[in-house]
């Protein structure tokens, strides 16, 4: 039995330490927004934040998380109204939607590190998150729209 700090709360989980974090999040904790895509950490659909860093949860053992805070798409904003989530809806980014939680989680770290991202910044940080529907131009536009809203919120 170990404790997992997820989305601001502590959850006791009884799993082997080598169990992928993805399956603990989905099957044990019951948060299904994080998706299984490839199982080898190459597509980004399973991206969550561990200690504030984007992490591929399908290849991260729950034992490797330790006491770090895990944030999933459900924890990005308690009401689902993070500027990225609003921009995704406003610009109708998803087609099938399967990769989108991972895209948004990666983009959240991008905007933390690059509050005014260039196309080059976006492409560089988002390159490992694959979208089989090829909505990359809408993703870029949504990231830029969210960046504007986040700067406006920061400036009051």
Residue ranges and their predicted role:
Residues 1-156:
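Signature of N-terminal electron-transfer/Fe-S-associated modules in redox systems
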């Amino acid at each position: 039995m170990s404790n997992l700090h997820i989305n601001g709360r502590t959850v006791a989980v009884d799993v082997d330490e080598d169990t992928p974090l993805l399956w603990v999040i989905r099957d044990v904790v019951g948060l299904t927004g994080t998706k299984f895509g490839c199982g080898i950490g190459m597509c980004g659909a399973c991206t969550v934040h561990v200690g504030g860093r984007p992490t591929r949860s399908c290849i991260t053992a729950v034992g490797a998380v330790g006491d770090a805070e895990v944030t999933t798409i459900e924890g990005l904003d308690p009401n689902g109204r993070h500027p990225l989530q609003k921009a995704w809806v406003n610009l109708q980014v998803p087609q099938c939607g399967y990769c989108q939680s991972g895209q948004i989680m990666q983009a959240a770290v991008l905007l933390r590190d690059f509050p005014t991202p260039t196309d080059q910044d976006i492409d560089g940080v988002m390159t490992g998150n694959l979208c089989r529907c090829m909505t990359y131009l809408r993703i870029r536009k949504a990231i830029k729209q969210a960046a504007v809203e986040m700067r406006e919120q920061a400036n009051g």
